[in-house]
């Protein structure tokens, strides 16, 4: 057909000038892709996009040339055979997730050169041949998550130079082959989380110069060596949460631009002092829920760019080794979790680290004070927010110069007892001044009253004098009454001597003489 059209074009060009137009129109029609022959029953068609979802077909539809997109989600496909999609040469995306696919042959995606997005997630795939993705060099996104992959073929991703996103989450992968991503020069996002990785090879991620985000969380890694991530110059986020990491080391001296690192939920007990010097631009660090008891001063000095850190849930030893961390926290101006509790010794268990440092005077040393404002940081910091920032005086034991580093020796609290004495003196002075001020106010009121209302003052004074006299008279009368009652009850001696009778009243006594009685005879 092509040769016939070419012959007609040449004939018309030679015979008539109008043949040029016809030739061009024919070439244009030849370049247009063929339209699909028809929409399969029970499927949904949107132009050149076909959706055959949740229909339970056992194989892919045929004779659908010209399709740009095909979705076969939520079906019962169990196998992808060689050449199964041969007639779909115009296809740009293919969704095969949520099926029962357990076997994929090496030539299953033959002639799908234009496919940019392939989704195979939520199936039962156990392995993929080396040649699986070879017919699709234009792939940008591949999703293999939630399958049963146990191993990756060494050349599985060979030739995928345009791949930018790769998902392999929630499989059973135990090892990442060396240089498996060597050709993935455009890869920016890689997720291998929720697998069974126990170790990493030094060159497992070689060639990923544009990688910005790497997920390795929920694996079985027991050691993290920053040398396993060489020359990842564009990496900004590294997630290693919920592994079994016990130590963090760096056996390769090089600098990378990492800005966010998540090491939470591990079993970290030791970190090399120089390990964070290779990431000078680190801004966010999660170290919560580990087994750290203290942090080396050299590590603290390397955290110069941090704006957020989590340290809760560790086994902090609130002895002398915690002083460097307490001093660093008191001067940290970023965000950190405030729930740092002491795990030892016994007398400090359950106490907040900074509160324990202040309450138990753990870091007092008058010789080399390294933080003059730790007291204010402890008393003024919020529970969940960052501590109060203040100017800090740093002492260098070697040369006596201030270079902005924390020495491992001690953290002094020079304001401890002196601050308490100053507070007491301040209270005494304030109370004395208040009394003097009150006395002066009373004197001022009396003076103003004496000047403005002299008659009222004289009447008031007379009332005071009169009231005082009445009180004295009442006191005298009560005393006399008490004396009379005492004589009546105490000195009275009953006798039958006829004589004078004494009558006592309130104002004095009267004497009455009684004459003896006489008997008369009748």
Curated annotation (Swiss-Prot):
Sequence segments annotated as region (Disordered): 382-401
LRR repeat positions: 64-87, 89-111, 112-135, 137-159, 161-183, 184-207, 209-231, 233-255, 256-278, 279-302
Every LRRCT domain range: 314-365
Gene: LRRTM1
Membrane topology label: Single-pass type I membrane protein
SMART domains given in the database record: LRR_TYP
Residue stretches spanning the membrane: 428-448
Keyword flag Metal-binding: no
Positions glycosylated per UniProt: 63, 130, 380
Extracellular-side positions: 35-427
Organism: Pongo abelii (Sumatran orangutan)
Keyword set includes Glycoprotein: yes
Domain LRRNT intervals: 35-63
The protein, known as: Leucine-rich repeat transmembrane neuronal protein 1
Signal peptide: 1-34
One term under GO cellular component: postsynaptic membrane
Topological domain spans for side Cytoplasmic: 449-522
Keywords, ordered alphabetically: Cell membrane, Glycoprotein, Leucine-rich repeat, Membrane, Postsynaptic cell membrane, Repeat, Signal, Synapse, Transmembrane, Transmembrane helix
Domain of life (superkingdom): Eukaryota
Role summary: Exhibits strong synaptogenic activity, restricted to excitatory presynaptic differentiation, acting at both pre- and postsynaptic level.
Cited InterPro entries: Leu-rich_rpt (IPR001611), Leu-rich_rpt_typical-subtyp (IPR003591), LRR_dom_sf (IPR032675)
């Amino acid at each position: 057909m092509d040769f016939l059209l070419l012959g007609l074009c040449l004939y018309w060009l030679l015979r008539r000038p109008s043949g040029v137009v016809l030739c061009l129109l024919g070439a244009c029609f030849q370049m247009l892709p063929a339209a699909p022959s028809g929409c399969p029953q029970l499927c949904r068609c949107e132009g050149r996009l076909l959706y055959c979802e949740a229909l339970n077909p056992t194989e892919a539809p045929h004779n659908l040339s010209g399709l740009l997109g095909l979705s076969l989600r939520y079906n019962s496909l169990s196998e992808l055979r060689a050449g199964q999609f041969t007639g779909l040469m115009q296809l740009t995306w293919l969704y095969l997730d949520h099926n029962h696919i357990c076997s994929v042959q090496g030539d299953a995606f033959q002639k799908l050169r234009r496919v940019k997005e392939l989704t195979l997630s939520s199936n039962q795939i156990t392995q993929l041949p080396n040649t699986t993705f070879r017919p699709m060099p234009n792939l940008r996104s591949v999703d293999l998550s939630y399958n049963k992959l146990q191993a990756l073929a060494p050349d599985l991703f060979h030739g995928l130079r345009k791949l930018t996103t790769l998902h392999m989450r929630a499989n059973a992968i135990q090892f990442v082959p060396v240089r498996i991503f060597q050709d993935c020069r455009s890869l920016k996002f890689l997720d291998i989380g929720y697998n069974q990785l126990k170790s990493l090879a030094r060159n497992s991620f070689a060639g990923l110069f544009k990688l910005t985000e790497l997920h390795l969380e929920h694996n079985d890694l027991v050691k993290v060596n920053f040398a396993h991530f060489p020359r990842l110059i564009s990496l900004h986020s590294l997630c290693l949460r919920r592994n079994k990491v016990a130590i963090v080391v760096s056996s390769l001296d090089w600098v990378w631009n990492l800005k966010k690192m998540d090491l939470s939920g591990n079993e970290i007990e030791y970190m090399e002092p120089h390990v964070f010097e290779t990431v000078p631009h680190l801004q966010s660090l999660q170290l919560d829920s580990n087994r750290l008891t203290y942090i080396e001063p050299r590590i603290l000095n390397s955290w110069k760019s941090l704006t957020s850190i989590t340290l809760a849930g560790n086994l902090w030893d609130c002895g002398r080794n915690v002083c460097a961390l307490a001093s660093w926290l008191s001067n940290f101006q970023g965000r950190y979790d405030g729930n740092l509790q002491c795990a030892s010794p016994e007398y400090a268990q359950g106490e907040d680290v900074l509160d324990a440092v202040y309450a138990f005077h753990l870091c007092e040393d008058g010789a080399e004070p390294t933080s003059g404002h730790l007291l204010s940081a402890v008393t003024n910091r919020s529970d969940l927010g960052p501590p109060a920032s203040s100017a800090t005086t740093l002492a260098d034991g070697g040369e006596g110069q201030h270079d902005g580093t924390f020495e491992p020796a001690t953290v002094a609290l020079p304001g401890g007892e002196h601050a308490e004495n100053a507070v007491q003196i301040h209270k005494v002075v304030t109370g004395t001044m208040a009394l003097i001020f009150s006395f002066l106010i009373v004197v001022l009121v009396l003076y103003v009253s004496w000047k403005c209302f002299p008659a009222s003052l004289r009447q008031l004074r007379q009332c005071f004098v009169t009231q005082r006299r009445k009180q004295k008279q009442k006191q005298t009368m009560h005393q006399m009454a008490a004396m009379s009652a005492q004589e009546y009850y105490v000195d009275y001696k009953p006798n039958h001597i006829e004589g004078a009778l004494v009558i006592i009243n309130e104002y004095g006594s009267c004497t009455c003489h009684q004459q003896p009685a006489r008997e008369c005879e009748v």
